[in-house]
């Protein structure tokens, strides 16, 4: 599952954002922007993440430790009963990953080659270096309108540009005499691949201010159809039983000339917030309609997130925040591989908001994402068995976010 719900600094203060009326609501609660104070707002955010993604096979941990920065921008113009808005952000994907000590799939391939000869081949990996990145950029424009003093509607159109990159080098050493007996020749594999796609979608929302202290909101994002086109450079001097072997045999969607669908699913978000004196409590639910989307031909289950949080205004200029989010991705084990593994996670957040004047607001947030490590399941790729049930997939992320809003 590719979507990112963390679109601003406010998310890493308190991930329960859908039920709130804020400038960042351009992304979380677009209908709620119709209830902002009149004015023009410009909001900018930067999420700074330290990300470790790892695969452990036979006690050896292969990890990528990388920094990722994700900016986002929101603009709102509110006057009377109407607002217009825009959002530019990284809406899906993640960091650039570099596995300098290799990936599990290549080591599993060496094991398979060795098992073909009951260990006589002596196959071993002599080079195993991979890097890759998935990033989806969004531009969204829309508006909102107050139907009554309690109810508003909002909506917009969005454009998504998606990129998925993979670069890999692998070399194998083995006994050439035994290799010749089983038809194995050559040593080197190389792949440099780019997948790109563009798509459009829509966003619809409702906001209901039941009272001055109680607010409900709903948002629906339509699916975004993305047909990826792959351009790749690949070289190999390896053959098995007369058939050429390439890295694209292990990562078929990254083979040159392959066109494949990997859509962003429809998303339904529900939220509520309640002010109690100097406190605000909030809760939310997000549902990802993965089953209805075409996602590289893999049968994903629907995913969901549940979140809640609190905000405490302990002075006229300062507010403290904290929150929690649980994410069930819906990704089946068969989808886990060297290029991605969408495992379930829990997010813990806290932060501060500083508003020195009516025109300036600063937000600081920190978060820790704890993932539920899982093993994969065996698969057969072009007659080569890869026992991914032996691989433990894991992630760990720490985040510091900074946001600033200026009201004209």
Residue ranges and their predicted role:
Residues 71-146, 150-152:
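Hydrophobic alpha-helical hairpins/lids featuring a short glycine-rich hinge
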Residues 1-96, 341:
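N-terminal, post-signal peptide beta-strand-biased segments of exported outer-membrane/organellar beta-barrel
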């Amino acid at each position: 599952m590719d979507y990112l719900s963390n679109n601003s600094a406010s998310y890493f203060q308190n991930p329960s954002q859908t039920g709130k009326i804020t400038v960042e609501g351009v992304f979380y609660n677009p209908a709620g922007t119709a209830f902002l104070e009149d004015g023009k707002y410009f909001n900018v955010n930067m999420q700074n993440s330290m990300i470790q993604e790892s695969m452990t096979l036979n006690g050896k941990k292969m990890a990528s430790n990388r920094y990722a920065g994700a900016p986002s921008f929101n603009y709102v113009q509110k006057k009377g009963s109407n607002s217009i808005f825009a959002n530019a952000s990284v809406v899906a994907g993640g960091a650039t990953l570099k596995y300098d000590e290799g990936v599990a799939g290549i080591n599993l391939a060496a094991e398979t080659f060795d098992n073909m000869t009951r260990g006589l081949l002596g196959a071993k990996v002599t080079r195993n270096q991979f890097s890759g990145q998935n990033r989806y950029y969004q531009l969204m424009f829309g508006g909102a309108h107050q139907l009554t003093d309690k109810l508003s509607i909002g909506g917009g159109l969005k454009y998504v540009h998606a990129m998925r990159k993979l670069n890999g080098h692998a070399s194998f050493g083995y006994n050439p005499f035994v290799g010749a007996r089983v038809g194995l020749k050559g040593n080197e594999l190389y792949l440099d691949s780019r997948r790109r796609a563009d798509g459009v979608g829509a966003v619809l929302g409702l906001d209901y201010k039941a009272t001055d202290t109680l607010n409900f909101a709903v948002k629906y994002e339509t699916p975004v159809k993305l047909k990826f086109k792959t351009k790749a450079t690949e070289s190999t001097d390896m053959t098995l039983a007369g058939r050429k072997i390439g890295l694209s045999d292990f990562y078929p969607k990254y083979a040159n000339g392959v066109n494949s669908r990997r859509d962003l699913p429809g998303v339904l978000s529900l939220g509520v917030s309640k002010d109690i004196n100097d406190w605000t409590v909030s809760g939310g639910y997000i549902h990802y309609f993965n089953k209805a989307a075409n996602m590289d031909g893999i049968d994903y289950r629907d995913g969901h997130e549940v979140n809640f949080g609190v905000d405490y205004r302990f002075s006229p200029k300062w507010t403290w925040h904290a929150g929690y989010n649980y994410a069930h991705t819906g990704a089946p084990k068969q989808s886990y591989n060297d290029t991605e593994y969408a495992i379930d996670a829990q997010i813990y957040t806290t932060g501060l908001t500083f508003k020195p004047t009516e025109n300036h607001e600063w937000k600081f947030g920190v978060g820790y994402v704890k993932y539920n490590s899982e093993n994969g399941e065996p698969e057969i790729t072009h007659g080569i068995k890869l026992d991914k049930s032996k691989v433990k997939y894991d992630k760990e992320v720490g985040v510091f976010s900074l946001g600033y809003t200026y009201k004209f």
